[in-house]
Amino acid sequence: MTTQNNPYVYAEAIQYQLANIVTPVPVYANFNRNYAKQPQFLTWQLRNVHQDVYTGGIQSNKGIDTPIFQISIFAQNKADAFNLSNDILQSLHGYSGQFGGPDGFFIAKADVHWLYNSYDNELGLNQIFLDCMIYVPA
């Protein structure tokens, strides 16, 4: 029976991939208001680790894993926020290949969806939110 990857494997790969796209901008796995003192930074959250479940006689054909993670971009300058989002869109959307560096795994495709952009008056930060679904052959 085919198994899906451990969520920790996905977390390590996401951190590696995003950090390499936006270097030297810091990338964090979760948001903490203390980071808001930086002029720009990225956070991500793994929202879904999903593998189709089949019923019937053949249970070993599980299809592909389709984990989804949200990318949150924060920047004091609007142009920086939009440029960071563009860097991610250009690098990830439609990407196929090794994901997460040499210790990562192969993905058949990455789909990046722009959810929305906003501005937080309290923090003085422009915000852009993206969803990324990766297709991992099982």
State what each model feature region is:
Residues 1-61, 79, 83, 95, ...:
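Small/polar-rich, solvent-exposed N-terminal microdomains that initiate assembly or binding
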Residues 74-91:
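Mid-chain, well-packed structural core segment of small domains
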Residues 63-76, 125-136:
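Oligomerization/assembly interface segments of phage tail-like spikes and tubes
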Residues 44, 60-67, 107-108:
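A short glycine/small-residue-enriched secondary-structure motif
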Residues 59-62, 121-123:
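Short, solvent-exposed beta-strand/turn "edge" segments of beta-rich domains on protein surfaces
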Residues 92-138:
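Acidic-leaning, charged glycine-interspersed low-complexity segments
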